[in-house]
Amino acid sequence: MRYNTAKLLVYDAEQVSKGIEKIQEHVENTEKYLSLYESTVINETDRIQLQELKALWEKYKSLVDKEVELVKSGKTEEARQLLLSDIDDIGDTLRDYFEAFVEYNTTAAKEKVDENKQVASTASTVMIVVIFVGILIAIALGVFISRIISKPIGQMVEAADRLALGDVEVDVKAETRDEIGKLAESFKRMIENIREQAYVVERIAAGDMTVDVRVKSDKDLLGKKLKEMVDTNNEVLSNINEVAAQVAAGAKQVSDSSMQLSQGATEQASSIEELTASLEQVANQTQLSAKNANQANELAEVAKNNAEQGNKQMAEMLNAMEEINNSSSNISRIIKVIDEIAFQTNILALNAAVEAARAGQHGKGFAVVAEEVRNLAARSANAAKETTELIEGTIKRTENGTKIARETAEALNKIVEGISKAATLVNDIAVASNEQAAAITQINQGIAQVSQVVQTNSATSEESAAASEELSSQAELLKRSIAKFKLKNMGKMTSNRYKEVSPEIMRMLEDYTENKQPKSYSKEENGEYSDGKETAEKDVGGLKQKILLSDSEFGKY
């Protein structure tokens, strides 16, 4: 710009006009760069220096404008004096300011680069520490959650063992509201149901047939069978009570039939023992499956928690990389501004060299200074270029790392979803296995009770055969046996006893003795298995009733 102001004094009007345009262009560019630099001020010292530079620039610009006006007015000598005095002095000062700015910003840029390297190193160290601490926390949480789950599971296992030994006075406390608490609540309801059914069986064993059996649902097989057994026993014992007077007349036929019933009951007892052993084996296998399913559920829950923790840490790493990327972009913009300033400084150095050449012998020292300024500007431009390339490479690698981290986060999300589904399935398997084990235990108890009933029937049959020779003693024994039971609707039972044996009963007993076949099981047309039960009808009080005549059923009579 100083070169252009000097040209105004030596060239013709056309060159003067072009010089004025060049001066205006330099003024606009300089003010644009000053405004751009002002937006990137890094500290208060830089801001104060910039304000001083702008004030000096305004003074320099006003002197240049004054020179232009003098040249336009034809006052060339006054313009020359102004150029050689005030404009040159302020120009030198302004050049010194620009050189100081270049040196200051170069130093600040180097310090900023070193600071960014230190921040990146610190961030890496912090990230490693955070990941290590997160792993320790995840392990601690896994151990803590495992203990929370294993304690109530252990209590339920202990209760199940006691229940398997026949102790119905066990209790399970549901202290939580999670899945374990729900499982404990279900286990508690199951124990209460078994305890209630055990109480019913105890009353039945004591001979109280007035007990009311409540069926929990359509799938409550044991409850329905207990109710059927109570109703059947009530019906059977009522019928026995009604036909007790006829037993004396049919003692001989009953004696023969009782021997056969005893043999059939013995065979049934043997079959039931084999069935009980098989059910116990199935029950043990089912309990083992339930235990394994519970352990798998715990492991799946721990894996799910670890995957979720890793996903959270990946999200934090993405945020940190995004911040590093933004900082690198800002530094890149600042380096570009420094590069532009170095370019302008180079131009100014060239102008200064031209001026020194024009000054001849007196401008040699100034030419040396201008050459050094130009070299410094070139070195600043090269350093800014290399720094820009490094920062751009860092940005690209950061973006690539961010992409990989996002893909890893998405994969972790899919892993969390898969583990959640697997945990749900394993939990369902565990619940189903526990329910199967409980159901098999109940069935095993029911079969044991049936076995006791069969053995009792066998003994009763033998006793009936031995006592059938004494008609009166048999009748009295039967009455005493019936008196042990408390039956429903005792007040409504007829007190009319048959003093003579019904001809229909006699024919029924004779037909049964002649046509009795060995017990066998066959598949009916409806797909169910039949045990060869025979039925007969009798007319009691004008009502027809079906009486089962198979080995097991007739033994109850």
Swiss-Prot record:
Residue ranges occupied by any HAMP domain in the UniProt entry: 147-199
Subcellular location: Cell membrane
Role, per record: May bind attractants or detect changes in the extracellular concentration of soluble sugars.
Residues found modified as Glutamate methyl ester (Glu): E274, E463
Name of the protein in question: Putative sensory transducer protein
GO molecular function, one term: transmembrane signaling receptor activity
Alphabetical list of PROSITE patterns matching this protein: CHEMOTAXIS_TRANSDUC_2, HAMP
Transmembrane segment boundaries: 122-145
Domain (Methyl-accepting transducer) ranges: 243-472
Gene3D superfamilies: 6.10.340.10, Methyl-accepting chemotaxis protein (1.10.287.950)
Keywords from the UniProt entry: Cell membrane, Chemotaxis, Membrane, Methylation, Transducer, Transmembrane, Transmembrane helix
Compositionally biased region (Basic and acidic residues): 511-541
Record membrane topology: Single-pass membrane protein
